């Protein structure tokens, strides 16, 4: 264990401070599989941890600008070790006395930060996908008079969501048996946020088809572009028709702690439920998500279970038996990450981190707007920004192909790591600026590298 901690310490120092350190060492999938098969047969176990460090993606590298995976605070290594060793499942109080108490403290602080009044509450669960599913199950339980949980659907049901929302909302609706027709996707406007002017039209159209709408979801922000929906307008619409208003703040819900950017979440304080991932913008390891309710009774009533060997029948508020509220019967002591970060650093650490990364998104936009051979998809509202190399002499098809090839070349090169996305048929390079060590100089270097590679890929017919 001492050797591993020394190895990790050296890895972190080198990753952050050495400019030549790669973000990843690319291997083809079959080659990677072949390596680990052979290692299992003949490899020395002493080499296992060094190989893992060498053959994984380094999120602490300042040139990591890829997926929405948080750069973990080193102190969470210790909370993770403790959780893994003690292995308290938490479903019932006696299998998680401290973590159940700690989880309540954490969720109460989060509810207060959102702006929920008493009797708000919530719990931690394993990821935004599961949290969004659970929230929509709560919505159905609260807003549909028929007992769907025990008796099945009595009529077609539906939820409203922007077409740019994370795919997990679509997946949750299908898991719930709503079907394709039960997912009412409202178009996005030119800024890739829900077009609130079309809410009424899509609602009435669904009602005319016999679909009972029971919930509407606001993205804070959407995954592809990092754009925040107008939560205040959605809340007013939800109130008009007595719909459950859920905020998917998996990525950007942490902006509740940012004095500069908390306005992006205006309206969330009146939502019925909200999701915030700790492993995105709160510097925690995967996977930990808070699901918060404006009225905590909805958390208690979502699931009807018959598990006498676990829980005794009682009408009391058994907050200490978390298995009553979560989809999981067993979960990790993920609350330790939240509690320790809040205890050691306070809420100000999230204010500093979120504000710094969102500011960097704006700075990157300014940098791109000065470059004639780059264009952005939309002005960033967070630390997510979509852009592409462009050339007026090239067709849309050519540009899509060039940008895709540039991205693959960067992946194989390993110095930088970024991803790609398609928006209305146009392929963009997509950066999520998660790393607090990433600077303007790193981003300038990235653009220079993209430009150099892109120019080499311009078809000869265009060069001539």
Region roles according to the model:
Residues 2-119, 411-412, 416, 434, ...:
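N-terminal entrance/gating region of PLP-dependent enzymes' catalytic architecture
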Residues 3-7, 101-105, 109, 352-363, ...:
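A non-catalytic, amphipathic alpha-helix used as a structural packing/dimerization or gating element
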Residues 23-27, 317-356, 365-398, 415-426, ...:
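Conserved small-domain helix->loop->beta segment predominantly found in fold-type I
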Residues 70, 164-166, 190-191, 221-223, ...:
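Short, glycine-/Ser/Thr-/acidic-enriched flexible segments
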Residues 131-300:
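Conserved PLP-enzyme active-site core in the AAT-like
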Residues 222, 266-371:
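Active-site C-terminal subdomain of aminotransferase-like
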């Amino acid at each position: 264990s001492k050797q591993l901690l020394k190895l990790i310490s050296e890895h972190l120092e080198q990753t952050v401070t050495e400019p030549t350190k790669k973000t990843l060492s690319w291997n083809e999938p079959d080659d990677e599989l072949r390596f680990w098969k052979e290692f299992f047969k003949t490899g020395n176990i002493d080499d296992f941890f060094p190989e893992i460090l060498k053959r994984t993606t380094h999120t602490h590298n300042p040139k990591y600008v890829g997926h929405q995976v948080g750069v973990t605070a080193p102190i969470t290594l210790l909370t993770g070790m403790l959780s893994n060793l003690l292995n308290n499942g938490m479903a019932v109080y006696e299998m998680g006395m401290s973590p159940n108490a700690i989880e309540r403290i954490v969720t109460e602080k989060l509810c207060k930060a959102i702006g929920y009044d008493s009797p708000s509450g919530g719990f931690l669960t394993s990821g935004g996908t599961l949290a969004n599913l659970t929230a929509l199950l709560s919505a159905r339980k609260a807003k549909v008079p028929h007992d769907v949980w025990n008796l099945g659907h009595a009529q077609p049901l539906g939820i409203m969501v922007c077409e740019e929302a994370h795919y997990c909302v679509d997946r949750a609706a299908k898991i719930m048996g709503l079907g394709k027709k039960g997912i009412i996707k409202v178009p996005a406007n030119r800024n890739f946020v829900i077009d609130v002017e079309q809410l009424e039209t899509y609602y009435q159209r669904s009602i005319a088809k016999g679909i009972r709408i029971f919930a509407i979801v606001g993205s804070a922000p959407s995954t592809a572009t990092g754009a925040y929906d107008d939560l205040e307008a959605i809340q007013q619409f939800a109130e008009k028709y007595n719909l459950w208003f859920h905020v998917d703040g998996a990525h950007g819900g942490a902006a509740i702690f940012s004095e500069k950017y908390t306005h992006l979440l205006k309206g969330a304080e009146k939502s019925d439920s909200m999701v915030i991932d700790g492993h995105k913008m709160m510097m925690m390891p995967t996977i930990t998500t808070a699901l918060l309710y404006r009225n905590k009774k909805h958390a208690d009533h979502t699931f009807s279970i018959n598990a006498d060997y676990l829980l005794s029948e009682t009408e009391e508020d058994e907050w200490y038996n978390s298995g009553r509220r979560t989809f999981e019967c067993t979960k990790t002591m993920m609350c330790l990450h939240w509690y320790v970060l809040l205890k050691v650093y306070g809420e100000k650490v999230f204010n500093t981190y979120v504000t710094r990364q969102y500011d960097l998104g704006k700075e990157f936009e300014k940098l791109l707007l000065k470059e004639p051979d780059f264009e952005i998809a939309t002005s960033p509202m967070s630390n997510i920004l979509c852009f592409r190399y462009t050339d007026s002499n090239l067709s849309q098809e050519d540009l899509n192909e060039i940008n895709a090839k540039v991205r693959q070349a960067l992946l194989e090169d390993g110095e930088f790591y970024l991803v790609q996305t398609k928006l209305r048929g146009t392929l963009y390079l997509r950066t999520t600026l998660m790393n607090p060590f990433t600077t303007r100089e790193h981003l300038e270097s990235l653009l220079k590298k993209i430009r150099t590679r892109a120019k080499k890929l311009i078809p000869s017919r265009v060069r001539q």
